UniProtKB/Swiss-Prot annotation:
Any GO BP: proteolysis involved in protein catabolic process
SUPFAM superfamilies: Glucocorticoid receptor-like (DNA-binding domain), P-loop containing nucleoside triphosphate hydrolases
UniProt-recorded name of the protein: ATP-dependent Clp protease ATP-binding subunit ClpX
GO molecular function, one term: ATP hydrolysis activity
Length: 423
C-alpha cells in the first residue's frame, strides 16, 4: 500500500506485513498489489528453515518411525533400499534410546554404530547429508583422511566431537545426544600386515584413537579447537549416547571377499577358478567382519561397528532417475540456471541414458554425472548470455557423444513460427 507524505509530492511506500516505510528498511519488494520488506523476507526464510528442520512427522511419543525417515530419504536418494532401511531403523532406535535413558529404567540400551560400505558414487555421503537436513538432534560429518593420532600434525579425533558441539551451539547436553558420520573410513586402514619401523600415524593409530569415543568416554574438547595445552580449559563431553556412522568405498575389498571361501591350490591338479563377474556392489553384500580385518581394520574397531550396511552399484536406470527425480536433481539445477537466462533446457531421454552409461564406464557412479554434464554444457553456458532470442536449448544423444552441438531454437518475432538452428 502507499501513503502520501505531508510535504512530499512523492508517495511513500509501506511494507504490507510489518507496516514499515521504505525509509526504515534496506529494500522494499513490490508485487501486483502488495509490498514486502527485506526484514520480513528474512523472517519468512527463518520460519521455512525451522519447519524444514522439523519436517519429519513424529508419532505420539515424539520419535519418527523408520518409514517416516525412509520417506524423507527417498526424496533425495534414489535406490539403495537396504542402506536406507538400515539407517532409518538405526536413527529411530537412537531416538528411542535417548527417550529411554531419560526414564532411568533398569535395562540399559546400548547403541549400534553403523558401517556403510559401497562403491564410489553410490550415495553414502548423500545419505548422511540428507539425514543432517531432517534430524532434530545435532549432526556432524567428519573426514577420516584429515585425522592423525595425538602428537602428530593433523586433527585429533576430539575435533569430531568439537564439530558436534558447534552443530549444537555448544550445548553439551544436546551434543551428547547427537549423530556423527565419519566419511572415508577405509582410508585409515593399516597400510600393511607387517610391523614397520615407520609409524602409521594416520592408519592404525587413528583407529585406536577412535575406539574410546565410539564406545563411550568423557572426551576433553578444546572450546576453540586445535591442539591441547595444559593451561587451556576443556569442555567435557560424554560420548556414550552419540551414534557413529562410518562410510567408505573400500577399494579392493571386493577381491578379498571373492577370494574367501574359494580355497587355493597349486600344481597340475589345481582347479581353475572362474573370475568373479559380479559387480562391486553385489560382491559387497557378502562382506563379513573377517574381510574388514584383512583389509586393514583392527578387530576392536570392527567390533564397535556391529551393523554392516552395503550399497549397490547404480545401474543405468538408477542414474537416469538420479539425473531427473530428486528435489536437487542435476537436470533441474541446470534447467534453473538456464531459466535465469530466459531459456528452456531440454534433455532427450536417449541423451540422459548415454550420460548414465558414460558415468558407469568411468566407474564414478552418481558423483561423475555433474562432470559429464558440465563438459556437455560448457560451450552453451559460455555463449548463451551473449545470444539474443534463444528460447530453447535441446540436448540429444549426438551432443553427449560430442558429434554435434546443442540445438538452439530461436524465437523469431517477425515470423509466426520459430526458426530452429544448430549452434
Amino acid at each position: 500500500m502507499s501513503k502520501t507524505g505531508g510535504n512530499d509530492s512523492k508517495s511513500t511506500l509501506y511494507c504490507s506485513f510489518c507496516g514499515k516505510s521504505q525509509h526504515e528498511v534496506r529494500k522494499l519488494i513490490a508485487g501486483p498489489t502488495v509490498f514486502i520488506c527485506d526484514e520480513c523476507v528474512e523472517l519468512c526464510m527463518d520460519i521455512i528453515r525451522e519447519e524444514s528442520k522439523s519436517s519429519l512427522v513424529k508419532s505420539r511419543d515424539g520419535v519418527p518411525t523408520p518409514k517416516e525417515i525412509r520417506r524423507v530419504l527417498d526424496d533425495y536418494v534414489i535406490g539403495q533400499d537396504f542402506a536406507k532401511k538400515v539407517l532409518s531403523v538405526a536413527v529411530h532406535n537412537h531416538y528411542k534410546r535417548l527417550a529411554h535413558a531419560t526414564k532411568h529404567n533398569d535395562v540399559e540400551l546400548a547403541k549400534s554404530n553403523i558401517m556403510l560400505i559401497g562403491p564410489t558414487g553410490s550415495g553414502k555421503t548423500l545419505l548422511a547429508q540428507t539425514l543432517a537436513r531432517i534430524l532434530d538432534v545435532p549432526f556432524t560429518m567428519a573426514d577420516a583422511t584429515t585425522l592423525t593420532e595425538a602428537g602428530y600434525v593433523g586433527e585429533d579425533v576430539e575435533n569430531i566431537i568439537l564439530k558436534l558441539l558447534q552443530a549444537s551451539d555448544y550445548n553439551v547436553e544436546r551434543a551428547q545426544r547427537g549423530i556423527v558420520y565419519i566419511d572415508e573410513i577405509d582410508k585409515i586402514s593399516r597400510k600393511s600386515d607387517n610391523p614397520s619401523i615407520t609409524r602409521d600415524v594416520s592408519g592404525e593409530g587413528v583407529q585406536q584413537a577412535l575406539l574410546k569415543i565410539m564406545e563411550g568416554t568423557v572426551a576433553s574438547v578444546p572450546p576453540q579447537g586445535g591442539r591441547k595445552h595444559p593451561q587451556q580449559e576443556f569442555l567435557q563431553v560424554d560420548t556414550t549416547n552419540i551414534l557413529f556412522i562410518c562410510g567408505g568405498a573400500f577399494a579392493g575389498l571386493e577381491r578379498i571377499i571373492s577370494q574367501r571361501g574359494k580355497g587355493t591350490s597349486i600344481g597340475f591338479g589345481a582347479s581353475v577358478q572362474a573370475p568373479d563377474d559380479r559387480r562391486t556392489g553385489e560382491v559387497f553384500r557378502s562382506v563379513e567382519p573377517e574381510d574388514l580385518l584383512k583389509f586393514g581394520l583392527i578387530p576392536e574397531f570392527v567390533g564397535r561397528l556391529p551393523v554392516l550396511a552395503t550399497l549397490e552399484d547404480l545401474d543405468e536406470e538408477a542414474l537416469k532417475k538420479i539425473l531427473q527425480e530428486p528435489k536437487n536433481a542435476l537436470v533441474k539445477q541446470y534447467q534453473r540456471l538456464f531459466e535465469m537466462e530466459n531459456v528452456e533446457l531440454t534433455f532427450q531421454d536417449e541423451a540422459l541414458g548415454l550420460v548414465a552409461r558414460k558415468a558407469i564406464e568411468r566407474k564414478t557412479g552418481a558423483r561423475g554425472l555433474r562432470s559429464i554434464l558440465e563438459t556437455i554444457l560448457l560451450d552453451t553456458m559460455y555463449d548463451l548470455p551473449g545470444l539474443d532470442s534463444v528460447e530453447q536449448v535441446v540436448i540429444g544423444p549426438e551432443v553427449v557423444d560430442g558429434k554435434s552441438k546443442p540445438l538452439f531454437i530461436h524465437g523469431d518475432r517477425n515470423k509466426d513460427a520459430p526458426a530452429s538452428v544448430s549452434a
